[in-house]
């Protein structure tokens, strides 16, 4: 080991980890937690600092605990005794003991110094106190277990005192010291259990007697005596220190767990954590409670809470990725490519909606993609290849609509160079900034194409200045980004753009190995009639061939067909080439990595085990809600949901729609997506919608068949289909708005000032008023205002003019009125009449 952890030093010294950590920080060592490590040299300095300073006062009491330690530390001491015996028989003990001391310091950083201190104190203070019978056996036990480390410190300190006595006593002293040192573990807890220790005084007297008896005996015999003595010692001490032994056991187990590194999955419950660290669930819950967290044994613990608990229980945790052993991509990448050749660059075209991305690509490859997209807006990602001067370039076209954020992010991750298209007549827009951020996040080089340069209102300088504000400065202004002015309509500047792309690709030295199995990234996926699940991929490395066994996340299969960007069936795709793969068992999520493996069994193993993990993870998610949330949900009519079933033609569109609809919510209403899938609207979707109250089926680029329509009509299920995402989102907004409670606004209709009051027996107080503003209406709501303060809010129960009932009195006229349930009207009060107007709420 290169380093020693703070908690290890603490366990050796018998102190708490936090105390040692504090001392280390006082010394200026860079440590943050008990798990932090320090070098051996720093550990020695830290030990000396603790012992020679504040530890001196504590030294006397820790010594008292040796009694307990004797029974527990049998194994290690025996080995040490053998070493000592050999050393003693060999030659001069004093000279050999000193070098041993140095070695011991290296091996167990702090014990030697501690032991020295304890030895001294015990010899001085403990001799006068005697408890003869019990202590004899104790002495026997501890004497034989002398370690080289322990003897040395004692001899050094006791030389002067023992010189006065006979030579043999010197060895006895060593024996005594060893006893004390041997019980080091007990004294580890010195600070907490000082009051409990009462047996130590017996040791010193009895030790001397035992040592004198054992003096002539061979070291090997001592070993035997150790075993016997320990047994008797344990038996005799049972009545006296049983509780202490229990505590000691706990401490020993604690020191073991301190060294433990516990591996935990990302998702772990309280009881699972307790099992892993060897504690009871109650202990863990108690600690959580003390930290202010209420938890049951089935609750999940987040990473932050796990770190806090690890600190509390002095364990080191390591979060392991359960999928690591199922990471087929990692296995693929582990094989180094021994052969590399140049590959075409993969270019992603990104930018704001309607800025001409697809039109630009359309001009480059001379097709009419934009006309086929609903509303001329790109709804799907397309991947295409073109040739320029004998060199090929792969293009990915991403949608610019705000709902397709994730699709743009995937495009950025799968690409080598990003083309940011900005309209010269429109400037930088929100999705332009977002596209720039995606490219920066993916660490992809950017080229800016200023489109629509042919328009009279085009202002390329404005675009440059706007982009410079967000850190995209053109090279002509001293920046590092290439700006190319183009027109997708006339073709102006398109060749310059392609040349710039090829130049950038040449600088990047893009290479791959076409002579190995394929690795590809899924750009788009869908469920097609007659073909089943299909995935549009771009090969990143290797060659993808028809017949290959592939795994793609939780999907697997055999490549039955590959279709290129022109719709032709082909046999293989090489690095940077796009293709549509047919043959997977399910629709893979966009952005997933597809890898060719050696056989169907391996592909199935990866996919099925990953699918099982995902299923377990989904099932294990807690559904617990807080009391506050629960009380809010229980309030009548508080939260209204619009249950919807979404079906789309592609995975990317489905994700975009789900993301947009989940944002349509407030504290009163929200969209509840009860099912979402790729493919046509089926009868099972209609059945599910019927089972869910007021559910609506939303289809995007898919339509129901005749049988499905008929069933929906019979069950009264509403099916809405769309081809443009704007329309779908707007319709859902309208549906949600209809569920919102109307907004009630007050409208003041008039004011009247009380000029006189009349008390009418059995009726109440009538206020004679002059209307000063607006109109006073009978049965209108009214509030009585006195000195600017509202003192009553009710309604006008009676309104008369010249003793006749009237419906309303306008400004400038006098009237008599009564306020319902209020007779304390006084001259000078103001009556304010108002009505409540309901307005439809909108999201």
Swiss-Prot record:
Record-annotated tr-type G domain positions: 342-511
Region (G2): 376-380
One GO location term (cellular component): cytosol
Region of interest: G3: 397-400
Region ranges (Disordered): 55-185, 209-228
Molecular function in Gene Ontology: GTP binding; GTPase activity; translation initiation factor activity
Entry annotated with the keyword GTP-binding: yes
Skewed-composition ranges (Basic and acidic residues): 62-106, 129-141, 171-185, 209-221
Positions of the UniProt region annotated as G4: 451-454
Protein keywords: Cytoplasm, GTP-binding, Initiation factor, Nucleotide-binding, Protein biosynthesis
Highest taxon, organism lineage: Bacteria
Residues noted as binding GTP in the record, renumbered to the chain: 351-358, 397-401, 451-454
NCBIfam families according to UniProt: IF-2, small_GTP
UniProt protein name: Translation initiation factor IF-2
Species assigned in the record: Nitratiruptor sp. (strain SB155-2)
């Amino acid at each position: 080991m290169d380093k020693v952890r703070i908690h290890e030093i603490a366990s050796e010294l018998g102190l708490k980890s936090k105390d040692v950590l504090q001392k280390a920080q006082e010394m200026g060592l860079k440590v943050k937690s008990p798990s932090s490590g320090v070098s051996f040299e720093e550990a020695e300095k830290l030990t000396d600092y603790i012992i020679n300073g504040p530890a001196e006062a504590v030294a006397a009491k820790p010594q008292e605990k040796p009694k307990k330690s004797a029974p527990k530390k049998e194994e290690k001491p025996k080995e040490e005794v053998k070493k000592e015996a050999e050393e003693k028989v060999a030659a001069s003990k004093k000279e050999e003991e000193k070098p041993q001391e140095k070695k011991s310091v290296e091996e167990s950083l702090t014990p030697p110094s501690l032991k020295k201190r304890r030895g001294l104190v015990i010899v001085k203070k403990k001799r006068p106190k005697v408890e003869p019978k019990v202590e004899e056996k104790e002495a026997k036990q501890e004497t034989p277990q002398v370690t080289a480390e322990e003897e040395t410190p004692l001899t050094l300190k006791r030389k002067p005192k023992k010189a006065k006595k006979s030579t043999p006593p010197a060895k006895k002293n060593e024996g005594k010291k060893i006893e004390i040192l041997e019980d080091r573990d007990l004294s580890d807890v010195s600070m907490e259990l000082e009051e409990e220790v009462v047996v130590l005084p017996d040791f010193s007297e009895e030790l001397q007697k035992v040592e004198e008896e054992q003096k002539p005996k061979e070291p090997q015999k001592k070993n035997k005596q150790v075993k016997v003595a320990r047994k008797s010692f344990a038996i005799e001490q049972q009545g006296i220190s049983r509780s202490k032994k229990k505590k000691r056991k706990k401490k020993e187990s604690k020191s073991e767990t301190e060294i433990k590194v516990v591996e935990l999955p990302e998702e772990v419950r309280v009881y699972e954590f307790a099992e892993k660290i060897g504690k009871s669930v109650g202990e863990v819950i108690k600690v959580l409670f003390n930290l202010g967290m209420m938890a049951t044994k089935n609750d999940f613990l987040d990473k932050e809470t796990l770190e806090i608990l690890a600190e509390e229980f002095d364990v080191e945790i390591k979060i392991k990725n359960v999928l690591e052993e199922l990471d087929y991509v990692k296995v693929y990448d582990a094989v180094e490519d021994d052969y590399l050749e140049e590959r075409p660059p993969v270019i992603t075209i990104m930018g704001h909606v309607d800025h001409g991305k697809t039109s630009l690509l359309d001009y480059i490859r001379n097709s009419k993609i934009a006309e086929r997209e609903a509303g001329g807006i790109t709804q799907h990602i397309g991947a295409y290849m073109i040739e320029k001067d004998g060199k090929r370039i792969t293009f990915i076209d991403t949608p610019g609509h705000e709902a397709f954020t994730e699709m743009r992010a995937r495009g950025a991750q799968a690409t080598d160079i990003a083309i940011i298209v900005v309209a010269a007549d429109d400037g930088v827009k929100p999705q332009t900034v977002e596209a720039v951020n995606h490219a920066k996040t993916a660490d992809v080089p950017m080229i800016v194409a200023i489109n629509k340069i042919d328009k009279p209102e085009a202002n390329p300088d404005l675009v440059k200045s706007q982009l410079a504000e967000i850190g995209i400065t053109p090279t002509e202004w001293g920046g590092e980004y290439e700006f190319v002015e183009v027109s997708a309509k006339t073709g102006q500047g398109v060749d310059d753009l392609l040349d710039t792309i090829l130049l950038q690709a040449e600088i990047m030295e893009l290479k791959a190995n076409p002579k190995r199995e394929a690795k590809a990234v899924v750009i788009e996926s869908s469920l097609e009639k007659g073909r089943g699940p299909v995935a549009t991929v771009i090969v990143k490395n290797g060659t993808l061939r028809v017949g290959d066994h592939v795994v793609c996340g939780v999907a697997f299969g055999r490549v039955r067909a590959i279709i290129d960007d022109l719709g032709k069936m082909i046999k293989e795709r090489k690095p940077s080439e796009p293709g549509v793969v047919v043959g997977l068992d399910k629709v893979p999520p966009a952005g997933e990595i597809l890898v060719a493996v050696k056989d169907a069994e391996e592909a199935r193993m990866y996919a099925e085990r990953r699918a099982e993990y995902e299923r377990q993870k989904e099932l294990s998610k807690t559904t617990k809600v807080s009391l506050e949330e629960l009380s809010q949900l229980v309030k009548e009519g508080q939260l209204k949901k619009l249950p919807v079933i979404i079906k789309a033609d592609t995975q990317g569109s489905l994700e975009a729609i789900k993301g947009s609809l989940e944002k349509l919510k407030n504290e009163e209403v929200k969209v509840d997506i009860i099912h979402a899938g790729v493919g046509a609207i089926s009868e099972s979707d209609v059945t599910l919608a019927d089972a869910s109250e007021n559910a609506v089926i939303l289809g995007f680029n898919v339509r129901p068949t005749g049988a499905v329509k008929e069933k929906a009509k019979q069950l009264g299920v509403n099916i809405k289909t769309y081809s443009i995402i704007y329309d779908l989102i707007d319709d859902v907004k309208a549906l949600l708005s209809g569920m919102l409670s109307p907004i009630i606004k007050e409208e003041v209709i008039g004011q009247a000032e009380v000029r006189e009051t009349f008390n009418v027996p059995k009726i109440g107080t009538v206020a004679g008023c002059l209307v000063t503003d607006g109109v006073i209406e009978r049965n209108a709501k009214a509030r009585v205002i006195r000195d600017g303060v509202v003192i009553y809010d009710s309604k006008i129960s009676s309104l008369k003019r010249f003793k006749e009932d009237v419906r309303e009195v306008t400004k400038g006229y006098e009237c008599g009125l009564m306020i319902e349930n209020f007779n304390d009207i006084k001259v000078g009060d103001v009556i304010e009449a108002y009505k409540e107007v309901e307005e439809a709420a909108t999201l």
